[in-house]
Amino acid sequence: MGTRKNLGWQVALTCMAAAASVQPAWAAEDSLVHRFLQVELSPDGAFVASVEGDSPVNATYPIVRELVIRSVATGARTQIALPCGHVPQCWPGSPAWSSDHEHLSFTLRKPGSHSYSVYTVSPDGSNLSKQIDFDGTVGDLHYLPDGKLSMLAIEGARKEVGATEAGAAVAGDLDAAPPEQRIGILTAGAVHWASPPDLFVYEYDLRPDGKGFVGTASPGDGDNNWWTAKLYTFSAADGSGQVIYSPTDIRQQLASPKVSRDGTTVAFIAGLMSDFGSTGGDVYTLPLKGGEPINITPERPASARALFWNCHNQLVSEELAGDKDQLVVLGAGHEPVKAKVLWSGSETLGRGDTSISLSCPSGLMATSRESFTAPPQIATGTGGKWKDLTTVNAGLSTPARVQSIQWISDGFTVQGWLLLPQHVDGKLPLITTVHGGPAYALVPSFRGPGLQQKLLERGFALFYPNPRGSFGQGERFTAANVKDFGHGDLRDILAGIDAAEKVAPIDDARLGLTGGSYGGFMTMWTVTQTNRFKAAVASAGVSNWQSYYGENGIDAWMIPYFGASVYEDPAVYAKSSPINFITNVRTPTFAYVGERDIECPAAQTQEFWHALKALGVPTSVMIYPGEGHGLRDPANTEDAMRRTVEWFDRYLK
């Protein structure tokens, strides 16, 4: 329901071109956070290419994006002149270096469309040349050993890739076959397909011999079927695919396939995951000549989030372990070994599966890094010793004191983050934010101007719990909310608030609650279970799991969590549906959602608001036209922030 890149109100993926003139009223332009979406190190370690830009107030993703190449030695910056200019939706992406490091290829979206081009440029910004115009989406570029480019592409795409994107209009033949994302090889200005036409390929990696690929794929609707994806090998010659691993447990999703440097083994992450792109689980390896997969991190109290093979053909995992982001070396991948911690810190590296870019044989790595109090920068280093390459966000700060806290709930050790205003005068109102997912974790990230900063400046303490169902404590913890949505995780959250009140001057009579996606559901659910909270704000929530099952565009994610469809076991859905307990609500609740949200349809928010209004509970609702799962238009993100702050001010001050 909510991905690693979806923090409730913070998601900002696309916007209309008209939004280019929108300036945030609550933040000066020079205080906006400059974010690095993709970082790619050249094979010789001399240059770092990055997709980056300033994010709007209260949003994570820049609406105007740049492609920049920096010298690792000097930090000298070259901005590539994009053919479509410096405007919204003229988005570069997927930078990929040629093996001789003489060329950088990248994709470029055509503003106002779902069509992309592929360009190549020299490191100094010269020799920009178009390789292809493509009627559809293109991403995940890789150079093959013969110098050709591979990619993931959807011919005739009707929307951007991903369920968080605004859905296409629900009209016409709903049974029509959806367009599939396939592996393509760019040959003489045309795309040669290297995967079957009836499979949607989610992620892939090259085999070093150039003869094919390994990837995760599933037939049918790509938004809906990732939860049943299998691991395939694909032939570069004829595009055929062969299943090499099919999960036997519905609670095992697959992510981050990475082929070893010698081509003998594929490593991947497997575990219970609620969203494509929000990765966490155990690390498995599988011999490509045949055999059974091996879990090489069984019972590890951590969640692997990304993988890569180092220059010595050893497997490295970026993992979340409690309140630490870590790089750990897992050996050759043939068997479970004691993990060697290469780096550990209370900060966050990179963005998902592209968290680390590696140059061999030097072993130099490049990434972006940030924390609650340190803004994003590009960093390079070896052995986990980082040195910032950029200073673009120097001077930005967060007006908060940050503390990681732990508590015991039902035998689980649960972790969360407590942020206090810099200046405390008496007892503080506390706002708890429940993250999306539920398979996700709220990790240290620099928010900049937006809701978090505004609330801190107004004297609110903020609490970010990672209850059962979250990443960071191992697979048993992540799966602990199966068939139990809203019950055990709510107990964890309430116990966490008790723990926060023991270490900070929190006023228990002034508690607020908010969250988006699964966090929006938890907000709607919580106010039906307790009157402890005096104000609530629900973003893109779920009020009725039974009706939600037939309304949303990704119902396949629910089977691993509920154990059966709503038609086979309606009771397990009913016991976690806020609407069935709606007469208990006394908490004033504001709710908002995007009109074209296919993950948490607007009807769910409307149903909840309608009930509260009929019952005389103070409520308000806002449905933002044209928006998907998370707000994109800066005017809408700012409006939601203003309404949220006013709501908490009204009932908690």
Feature annotation, model-predicted:
Residues 10-21:
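Bacterial N-terminal signal peptides
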Residues 40-47, 93-103, 141-148, 204-212, ...:
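Blade-terminus and WD-like Trp-Asp/Gly-His loop motifs, strongest in beta-propeller folds
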Residues 26-34, 188-194:
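A short helix->beta-strand "capping" segment at the edge of beta-propeller domains
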Residues 351-653:
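Serine-hydrolase catalytic core recognition
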Residues 78-82, 129-133, 192-195, 242-246, ...:
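Beta-propeller fold detector
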Residues 72-75, 122-126, 187-190, 235-239, ...:
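Short loop/turn segments that connect beta-strands within beta-propeller blades
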Residues 32, 52-66, 83-90, 107-119, ...:
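A flexible loop/linker signature enriched in serine peptidases of the S9 family
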Residues 76-106:
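Blade-loop segments of beta-propeller domains
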